[in-house]
Amino acid sequence: MKDSIRHLIQQALVRLTSEGVLPEGLTPAIQVENTKDKSHGDFASNIAMMLAKPAGMKPRELAEKLIAALPQDAQISKVEIAGPGFLNFFQNSDALAQRLETALADAQLAVHKASAKQRVVIDLSSPNLAKEMHVGHLRSTIIGDAVGRVLEFLGDEVIRQNHVGDWGTQFGMLLAYLEEKPAAAESELADLEQFYRAAKQRFDESPEFADRARELVVKLQAGDAQCLSLWTRFNDISLSHCQKIYDRLNVKLTPADVKGESAYNADLADIVEALREKGLLTEDNGAQCVFLDEFKNAEGNPLPVIVQKAGGGYLYATTDLAAMRYRSQQLHADRVLYFVDQRQALHFQMAFEVARRAGFVHEGMQLEHMGFGTMNGADGRPFKTRDGGTVKLIDLLDEAEQRAYTLVKGKNPELDEAELRQIARAVGISAVKYADLSKHRTSDYRFNFELMLSFEGNTAPYLLYAYTRVASVFRKLGKGIDEISGQIQLDAEQELALAAKLAQFGEVLNSVGEKGEPHLLCAYLYDLAGLFSSFYEHCPILGAEQEAQKQSRLRLAALTGRTLKQGLELLGLEPLERM
């Protein structure tokens, strides 16, 4: 609808320019926004205020001329001037009802991508396999997953890449411990964190063990068969731990999506050589660097991207450049989204620039760092255990499910144990995910079980319950959401408000896909649930006075239910038919 209004305004501008009211050569970015107060219409534009000065007119005077020049459109009932010169557009309720009918008849809810479809690589999760997944991995995993789901729904081809840390000096230490205690390894590897701590303790206390660890790193990097066998076994166990977490989080990551650091080992020397051939390398204290004039340190000197250490070893930047080249040349990506901590912003800005200069990525390929803030504890500091250690993700999910179980059992003591557990799992996991996804991606946030498990406010339990309310209407009716006949008619204020929000679903999803910000979808679903609650309270559905009105309201409820369910699923949450 916003695009339609922009087009109408553009036509009015062309007409006013041809009539000499506006000077030639104006190319304004026409802004159309949703209004918050529906007494001011459904959409507003500040175009008259933007162009008043070049037109040599007062904004309200230009606004009047724009309204007179606007073509007639069946979707718009009227246009008014507000305040200093805003144009307020009121939707035609019949045209709005027809748009909702189109959405109801479509499996995609009439949602289409506003721009051309693309092949998108999403770099997400990417834990270090030397340790167990902890809370720090949650944001990359679930934000990347939600954005990937939305892009797929919009029609993009999405390729997920789990760039796990499966290489590096720490693996020598782990392999030495695995070699030293093969019998105990199986049971100890069940707790990767404990295994890592035990290996680290041996490394710190025994010079002989430390020497053996360093020796094994060299052998591993040289491709020693026995070392590779031990390394593969360790990684397989670690990845199986990760996969259990992904399955539990309902995240669309599989073993086939793993493309770890080690996958690029054979390319690293070639990356350095390619940079040398392009004349981009400078030696600095024995290290091979690419200096970038656009990025300077506090003294005003260019910052380096180091791609090879003086001793010959490679760095994260080298691996990232190899991955960018692979994603361009082998995966033929149009767009690559990196869901990595905000603190890595400079690293990625510099790596992207080197990749472009070196020709590792094709012209027009979009490289975007989707940085995110930190999950903090109640004290506002990074979330830790009582003894200051990192919180294992599995422990967090266990506690969430147990708290949800206590909550659900208290509200529904009559439910059998199996259903209680199933509901508690969905509510607990959804609560953790939604508390994160509903915050702006770049914001830090405080983790709080009490708030996230509340049935009030912008929480997963509130939204899951909102969907069950819709489902209960159709259970009472004895019909499915997709079995309702009749036509939508919009009369009551609450019907119009709900309908206007339903019509915005596609626009919101396009914004999520473009910006990589799932909180926009969360805010939309929360508003939608609130508007449905008001509609449900003021507009009797099954008790409507006339049959046509009953069918219309059932159709509105059906579209609300389908939109809520689709939105929850795109966030990676599990809708429940009853709680």
From Swiss-Prot:
Report the top EC class in one word: ligase
Q: GO terms for biological process?
A: arginyl-tRNA aminoacylation
Q: Under which EC number(s) is this enzyme classified? A: 6.1.1.19
Matching InterPro entries: aa-tRNA-synth_I_CS, Arg-tRNA-ligase, Arg-tRNA-synth_N, Arg-tRNA-synth_N_sf, ArgRS_core, DALR_anticod-bd, Rossmann-like_a/b/a_fold, tRNAsynth_Ia_anticodon-bd
Please name the GO terms that the record assigns under molecular function: arginine-tRNA ligase activity; ATP binding
Entry keywords, A to Z:
Aminoacyl-tRNA synthetase, ATP-binding, Cytoplasm, Ligase, Nucleotide-binding, Protein biosynthesis
Reaction(s) catalysed (UniProt annotation): tRNA(Arg) + L-arginine + ATP = L-arginyl-tRNA(Arg) + AMP + diphosphate
SUPFAM superfamilies recorded for this chain?
Anticodon-binding domain of a subclass of class I aminoacyl-tRNA synthetases, Arginyl-tRNA synthetase (ArgRS), N-terminal 'additional' domain, Nucleotidylyl transferase
Pfam families xref list: Arg_tRNA_synt_N, DALR_1, tRNA-synt_1d
Q: At the top level of its lineage, which domain of life is listed?
A: Bacteria
Listed GO CC annotations? cytoplasm
Q: Where is the short sequence motif 'HIGH' region located?
A: 127-137
> Where does it reside?
Cytoplasm
Task: Extract the NCBIfam families matched here.
Answer: argS
Assembly description: Monomer.
Member of which family? Belongs to the class-I aminoacyl-tRNA synthetase family.
Q: What is this protein called?
A: Arginine--tRNA ligase
Origin species, per record, is Stutzerimonas stutzeri (strain A1501)
